[in-house]
Every structure is written in structure tokens, then in C-alpha cells.
Amino acid sequence: YDIVITSTEFMATYANSGEFINFNDIDPDFKLDSGICGYQDTSYWNYETRSFDAKNGEFIGIPVNGNVQVLYYRRDLYEEKGLQPPKTWDDLIKNAAEFHNPPRMYGMIQRSERGAVTYNFGPYMFSYGGAVYKDPQNGDFSIVFNSENNRKALEKYLEIRDKVGHPNAHSIGQGEMIQYLRTGKAA
């Protein structure tokens, strides 16, 4: 293919395999506008360090899908109870508990089906200082997923599921989450 659209999480795989070419080989004067969000440098690949690197990498793609995580909540319900949007995971548990009345309503719907759980767990992991790789910016792709920070993040993820989530979170994907929100069964 001459042009593909892919999500940022697949960029490293394609870039490292040599499936992308440097845009500047086609147009040496092309520069990505500074107003375009770079999603952690995913437009630039450094073949030497095998990492994203806007400073020393080759320009391989225009970022259009950063898979930004968003916490949805029902503003009408929050206003009715005088709640503020949560700033911490514990705030989220406290707020969600106000609405949790299964099966009529769930305080939190987590997408935890196979595949979707990787998207949902990311914000927990990063908020606890966790990571998958040790130092990818400097080419160290040692796996550090089994770290203390990631363990704490997983414990919080499971705490939210167990206290205010759906008992079958493992079967909920994007479509199911949307239906819970649209039908008023999620706060």
C-alpha cells in the first residue's frame, strides 16, 4: 500500500520492520506543522535505537489517531448529587459508589474484554508510574511490566471493578460500554 492508517500502538512494529519509508525521501522540504500533536513522537522513528525520537528519527507518518483515553461520566447525575468530576482513582470509587446499584446501574464500566483491556489499563499503569518497557527512548526495550508500580495499578483497577464495576467486566468492549452509557445503566 502507498498510504495506510494505523493507530499509534502499532507504529513501532511497522517502523521497526521497515514497512514505513521516510516522508522526507519523497519530499525533502516537508515538515510536520508544530501545531499538530505528536503523540509522544510517534511520527519519527530512530532506526538505530529502535524508538520514537522526534530529535534524531526519520519522519514516518502523520499522527491522526492517538487513542487518547477519556473518562466519561453523566454530568446530570453528578450535578444531581453535587459531585465533582474525580481527580484521583479514590475519588472515582467514592463518586461511582453513589450510583452503584446493580443490575439497574453500575458506578463504573470498564472495557476489560480481551484486547480492550490494554486500552483501559494504560491510564492506571501510567498514573502509577508504571511502564511496559524500561527505557524505549534510549533503545532499552527490556520488559518491566511485572513491576511494583504496575502491580499497584492493577490492584486499583481490580478494586474499582470489584467495588463499583460490572461483575462481567471481562466481557465488556467498546460497544457494550456505549450501550450501558446510552441506556442509563452507567454513571
What are these regions (language model features)?
Residues 8-68, 84, 93, 120:
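Hinge/lid segment of periplasmic solute-binding proteins
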Residues 15-19, 83, 97-104, 130, ...:
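Sec-exported extracytoplasmic/periplasmic mature domains
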Residues 24-38, 112, 130-152:
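Short, solvent-exposed loop/beta-turn-alpha elements that line the ligand-binding surface or hinge
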Residues 47-64, 69, 93-142:
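Extracytoplasmic/periplasmic solute-binding protein
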Residues 96-98, 138-171:
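Glycine-centered hinge/linker elements that transmit conformational signals in sensory
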